[in-house]
């Protein structure tokens, strides 16, 4: 099993190895790990780090590729609530610093409203379609605790819940 550094560096070498010198590749790897707060664990192996740290290494590996669009499928789903919140906050900061667009799949309503500028809600089933799109007009940076009572946050959250528990059910019945 590879260390945190080697895990990210392997991907960096594959993508940039032909065009960049070794010192540049090393610097790119270290910068990606620093971006997700993992500089202190460069030489740690998977069995030596937590689940949240493993997620951050995966995010660092993806960000090191300098993607215009970062695709994330339930990236925080298996984490405890505090680790999830910390990584969500880190992701908000990373997006500000890198300017990357993130497309994330999540089943967590609060996560969707906190992290998104737009929420695309899908209908159920194998023939799922776009059910509704909610624009989230919250200012950035976003402060999780302050948002709990923010009327715009509450309104967006309510829109998502209404779709999931009322209109979504209606869409399903029409399709059947």
Show where each model-derived region lies.
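Conserved ABC ATPase "signature" region
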Residues: 16, 20-41, 93
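Conserved ABC ATPase signature
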Residues: 45-49, 53
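Catalytic Walker B motif of ABC-type/P-loop ATPase nucleotide-binding domains
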Residues: 70-73
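Conserved H-loop
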Residues: 99-105
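A short, proline-enriched helix->beta-strand linker immediately N-terminal to the Walker B motif
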Residues: 64-68
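Short helical segment in ABC ATPase nucleotide-binding domains corresponding to the A-loop/adjacent helical element
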Residues: 5-13, 135
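Hydrophobic anchor residue at the start of the ABC signature
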Residues: 59
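Signature (C-motif/LSGGQ) region and adjacent switch/coupling loops
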Residues: 5, 42-45
């Amino acid at each position: 099993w590879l260390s945190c550094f080697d895990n990210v560096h392997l991907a960096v070498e594959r993508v940039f190895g032909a065009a960049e010198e070794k010192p540049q590749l090393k610097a790119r790897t270290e910068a990606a790990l620093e971006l997700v707060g993992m500089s202190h664990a460069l030489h740690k192996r998977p069995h030596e780090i937590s689940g949240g740290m493993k997620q951050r290494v995966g995010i660092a590996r993806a960000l090191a590729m300098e993607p215009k669009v970062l695709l994330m499928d339930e990236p925080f789903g298996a984490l405890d609530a505090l680790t999830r919140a910390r990584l969500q906050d880190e992701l908000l900061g990373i997006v500000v610093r890198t300017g990357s667009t993130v497309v994330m799949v999540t089943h967590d309503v609060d996560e969707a409203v906190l992290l998104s500028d737009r929420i695309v809600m899908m209908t159920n089933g194998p023939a799922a379609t776009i059910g509704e799109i909610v624009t989230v007009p919250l200012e950035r940076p976003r402060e999780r605790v302050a948002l709990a009572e923010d009327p715009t946050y509450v309104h967006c959250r309510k829109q998502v819940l209404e779709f999931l528990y009322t209109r979504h059910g209606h869409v399903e019945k029409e399709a059947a």
